[in-house]
């Protein structure tokens, strides 16, 4: 009998180790599912664990339950936090073909502005605005659509839910108040091009179809004045878009009506400002040298105060 026990210990023929292995494998699978769910949703350890336990470790069902709970809690939290100051946030910019959108989304702290859930929402809002404008009736002119907070909340995303619903969901995730502040969207005819810029600029600028975000943003509508388009024209236009962010012009300016400011540091007309990339030239001189004309531009600074009438505009070229 002693020999039999020793043999079992050496060869592992006892049933206890086998049960232990099965328990260990199950525990490992649960940990893996928990880690996957947390990474995918960003919700707390406790909530993810509860969701998996309720749905037999079914990831899809657990994720759906978490989203439904977060939506309910998000609207509740959004109501409780409503009215709290949201002076921080991000500006999202997306140019896709002949449509450009710039959206400002605000939050309470810079800490949340760096949160992935918040940044993803800014990108989703930018893309939603582009899709929304694509569905509107248009004409042969450059159109400029201003959207206020309430109008933005009504825009539907591809999943059928509104931006307002997704805002509440995000508020429930980040735990502080947030708001859809405003948006400006352009839709350009064939002869007009669009470009955009955000500051700080993203490290990887090789994916133009992905919405960019920063503390400042600008959109620029431009066209070539020559029949043959200069291949460098779009690069110059983007530099001018960057100039708009840095130098804060308030209007385009017209040589026939406007005179340069007496003090160049006080200049607010875009065409008379010293070019940010090379102050030895004015923006107007750079545009003329590259056979470009700026049709319109818009600049957002996160947290700035603007007049309500500026958010509802329509421009023609």
UniProtKB/Swiss-Prot annotation:
> Does the keyword field hold Ligase?
no
User: Source organism's superkingdom?
Assistant: Eukaryota
UniProt-recorded name of the protein: Elongation factor Ts, mitochondrial
Q: Where in the cell is it found?
A: Mitochondrion
Function of the protein: Associates with the EF-Tu.GDP complex and induces the exchange of GDP to GTP. It remains bound to the aminoacyl-tRNA.EF-Tu.GTP complex up to the GTP hydrolysis stage on the ribosome.
* HAMAP family per UniProt: EF_Ts
- Homology family: Belongs to the EF-Ts family.
Q: Where is the transit peptide?
A: 1-24
Q: Which residues form a coiled coil?
A: none
Any one biological process term the GO annotation gives: mitochondrial translational elongation
Any one GO CC term of the record? mitochondrion
Could you list this entry's UniProt keywords, alphabetically sorted. Elongation factor, Mitochondrion, Protein biosynthesis, Transit peptide
Asked if the keyword Transport belongs to this entry, the reply reads no
Q: Which InterPro entries match?
A: EF-Ts_dimer_sf, Transl_elong_EFTs/EF1B, Transl_elong_EFTs/EF1B_dimer, Transl_elong_Ts_CS, UBA-like_sf
SUPFAM superfamilies named in the record: Elongation factor Ts (EF-Ts), dimerisation domain, UBA-like
Query: Where mainly located?
Result: mitochondrion
Q: Where does this protein come from, organism-wise?
A: Culex quinquefasciatus (Southern house mosquito)
- Taxon lineage: Eukaryota, Metazoa, Ecdysozoa, Arthropoda, Hexapoda
Output the Gene Ontology terms for molecular function. translation elongation factor activity
